[in-house]
């Protein structure tokens, strides 16, 4: 099925949301590198906080903190922003033997792409997998203790859209889904997948 739809004009957004366990809680850093203010909405599952809204001015950043669910330490947080910007962070604050990876996202305008920098804050080797929803392909690689690995995905063929899910071998509770659109100042296409995120 062709998920690409009508042509759309460029918009002034360049958004980021980075999540990680820190000081016994889960922290999300929101950053707006665009030219206009952007509103983020963050929804948590039951036993945590309800919906929160954040307005981040152009060139600014904000952060929020969440405790894990009572009794389990589980977290499941979903971030929505303009133009299909989407992040989902799932896991347990204590992790599974500490097997977690930290992810930072950057965008390439020319050539059009999205890049993930994956850092291993633990003392053990991690096997990280990234599932690309657009081509149903999984990439797996090793991140050594205290080291980082960078992987890039071209998005020309998807009209600038991406949808990637990061998991760590041996930790079934941990996952990050990162999806949205990379703006490059040119006309693009809308995308029906943005209405069907898991």
Mark where each language-model region is.
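Long, His/Glu/Asp-enriched segments that create or flank divalent metal/ion-associated functional microenvironments
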Residues: 1-23
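Intrinsically disordered, low-complexity Pro/Gly/Ser/Thr-rich segments with frequent PxxP/GP/PP motifs
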Residues: 44-72, 132-163
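Glycine-centered tight beta-turn/hairpin loop motif at sheet-sheet or coil-to-beta transitions
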Residues: 35, 47-49, 82-84, 134-136, ...
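A structural motif detector for short, solvent-exposed N-terminal "entry" segments of globular domains
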Residues: 16-20, 106-113
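Copper-binding active sites and cupredoxin-like electron-transfer domains
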Residues: 75, 122, 126-129, 142-147, ...
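Asparagine-centered strand-capping/turn motif at beta-strand->loop junctions
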Residues: 22-38, 42-44, 112-126, 130-132
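Terminal connector regions
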Residues: 67-111, 155-198
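Predominantly soluble domains enriched in secretory-pathway, periplasmic, or organellar proteins
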Residues: 37-40, 44-47, 54, 81, ...
